[in-house]
Amino acid sequence: MSFNHQEIEKKWQGYWEENKTFRTPDETEKPKFYALDMFPYPSGAGLHVGHPEGYTATDILSRMKRMQGYNVLHPMGWDAFGLPAEQYALDTGNSPAEFTEHNINTFRNQIKSLGFSYDWDREVNTTDPNYYKWTQWIFLKLFEKGLAYVDEVPVNWCPALGTVLANEEIIDGKSERGGHPVERRPMRQWMLKITAYGDRLLEDLDELDWPESLKDMQRNWIGRSEGAEVHFNIDGTDEKFTVFTTRPDTLFGASYCVLAPEHALVADITTAEQKEAVEAYINSVKMKSDLERTELAKEKTGVFTGAYAVNPVNGEKLPIWIADYVLATYGTGAVMAVPAHDERDYEFASTFNLPMKEVVKGGDITKEAYTGDGAHVNSAFLDGLNKEEAIAKMIEWLEVTSAGNQKVTYRLRDWLFSRQRYWGEPIPVIHWEDGTMTAVKEEELPLVLPKTENIRPSGTGESPLANIDEWVNVVDPETGKKGRRETNTMPQWAGSCWYYLRYIDPNNSEALVDPEKVKQWLPVDIYIGGAEHAVLHLLYARFWHKVLYDIGVVPTKEPFQQLFNQGMILGENNEKMSKSKGNVVNPDDIVASHGADTLRLYEMFMGPLDASIAWSENGLDGARRFLDRVWRLFVQDNGELSEKITDAPNKDLEKAYHQTVKKVTEDYAELRFNTAISQMMVFINDAYKAETLPKEYVEGFVKMIAPVAPHIGEELWSKLGYNETITYASWPTFDESKLVEDEVEIVVQVMGKVRAKLTMSKDASKDEMEKLALEAIQDQIEGKTVRKVIVVPGKLVNVVAN
């Protein structure tokens, strides 16, 4: 008979809720373990089967660690600000707050139905004013430290929608919603100076237990480059511009310069003859995103300004072009071009027939750019030097002549932090009529997002908050000075940068987190989530954590000690699950048909946790069949415990049991859940063959399966006679000596041919082995003379007889 999953799951979920089984005390006697999931955005679509994969992994670890005597922090919350809720509100006329609350309730119920051992008393919600009070507080600290500033930045402006769009919301230069044209336009934006932490964000990666591939993604994103800045005067004017280059040794080979179309000097230096062409080009670039502009494969475009720069090292005049592959937001917005030794410059020079000059020997520049090392030529005081020597000598020359200097730059840009949206945290800043700007006082936080029916974009590039006069307009009570609140809101990243800290102390109204508690719980021991957050979320969270470390709020340099990216669950056809493809599997349906324990077991058994694997109904059915086999082995049809279960030991199962405890314990700790489950299946097969089942082994097995299938675990535990939950029962241990066989199989040969196989004690002496072997082959050697007996202890006996 199989078990009734609906009955059992409802019963134990009710028990856990009523008894607050997973409440985490802030005690310090036990060692701590902090298992964190990337909290979800509560979308209207609800949970999909990809969510529980990571959640089950952290839950297995959390449940095992509790049984091993750890105080476990395993929380859940909601990353609930963001564009989809605002979009839904615009489309339906409903409030984003109501929509979000409804979605959170759906998500919470779905997550509870899967039996995760979260401490729901610690639930956080980024849209709760009691939470975002502290998001705003962190912003104030950034502002005080000079790490939050206002700048004019080119953004994606959609005139038809009257709002700024993120790069992800644009497809082929048109808005994803409605297909309207999008243009680049400079706008006043809040920026966070993450670049000030570039070196620390890079260096501290070495101390983390993260996948190397993920660390490399962060390293590449930060993109530290060492080189030099070079100053170029513009011929016939007092103007100059600066370029950064990693190859100052090739300065003698520069044959033209390129400015970003948005560069401040372009309008001033363009000649009358070139004005029309330059303006037309600048307009054409407005429609392109940074991503499109810098694509390596795209055709090179550009236009000559009519102006010339002067090469500081030899006085040569270099034509100044503008081209879209140079971005105003990257580096200095200007490059010196050395087509003979740079691939992109080579393509551009080939397209526009610009001169090339070889300054490093080793290639054939009539065919391609040579980017390798070699002796310098045509380079005056650098001739004959290799790359490293020439770079050092040129930097020395630049610094002596004040034509440039040594410089380290980063690919990392400062973080564009403002959004022209309603549904986000208000930025706590006031702009006064006299042009000054002050932060809202700490005691006035939270600055609450006002309720409004009118969340349509303002059309001016400001957020919809600009429409709410009574909220926006303020008067300084002391001076009578008039001001306007900042109308931009924070991005969705803000609330997710620090949520792991709030779980530690979720109801503290006096501080972001209690210093003693944060000392107890940090760093997070394991953080599991999807690889799509490998760069931005983790980089932003690490940045904020380091700022909080600098001001004494947190005691560790890094937030997440170990990180793991789960793979993706694909549709049965190996395609990504999506509503449009109609291949989305809803976990509610599986919980109803097969049970939460089956879903959890199946998702952990599909394959390695970091692999992307296709969903399979057959696999799901197989997982259920295994749980049914476990149930039938231990429970009779009448619901009583199996009569095979006894207090007496059973030598036949001893090795299999201890092997299983060892492998499951080690595999769980290393996140190898699929192989741990395989081992439990092997044990169940052995247990079916055994005459009796020692109760100690049954209890040990139930403890091991409970982290994966907690409802069945609890039910079997209660049938074994326990009134308390299995949650805090002690984890089974194994005996190394029991993993070794006491007896071995010995091969007996006569003249090199196998004639018998014997089982004997592994410690049998040579004499004993010889005696037993000769007895076993008595009939084979009858009438023959035994000339010699070769004994290999523990392995074989070879008898030479003729």
From Swiss-Prot:
SUPFAM superfamilies: Anticodon-binding domain of a subclass of class I aminoacyl-tRNA synthetases, Nucleotidylyl transferase, ValRS/IleRS/LeuRS editing domain. GO terms for biological process: leucyl-tRNA aminoacylation. Its main location: cytoplasm. One of its GO terms (cellular component) is cytosol. A motif ('HIGH' region) lies at residues 40-51. Keywords: Aminoacyl-tRNA synthetase, ATP-binding, Cytoplasm, Ligase, Nucleotide-binding, Protein biosynthesis. A motif ('KMSKS' region) lies at residues 576-580. Its EC number is 6.1.1.4. It catalyses: tRNA(Leu) + L-leucine + ATP = L-leucyl-tRNA(Leu) + AMP + diphosphate. GO terms for molecular function: aminoacyl-tRNA deacylase activity; ATP binding; leucine-tRNA ligase activity. It is found in: Cytoplasm. ATP binds at residue 579. InterPro entries: aa-tRNA-synth_I_CS, aa-tRNA-synth_Ia, Leu-tRNA-ligase, Leu_tRNA-synth_edit, M/V/L/I-tRNA-synth_anticd-bd, Methionyl/Leucyl_tRNA_Synth, Rossmann-like_a/b/a_fold, tRNAsynth_Ia_anticodon-bd. Belongs to the class-I aminoacyl-tRNA synthetase family. NCBIfam families: leuS_bact (TIGR00396). This is Leucine--tRNA ligase. It comes from Bacillus thuringiensis subsp. konkukian (strain 97-27).
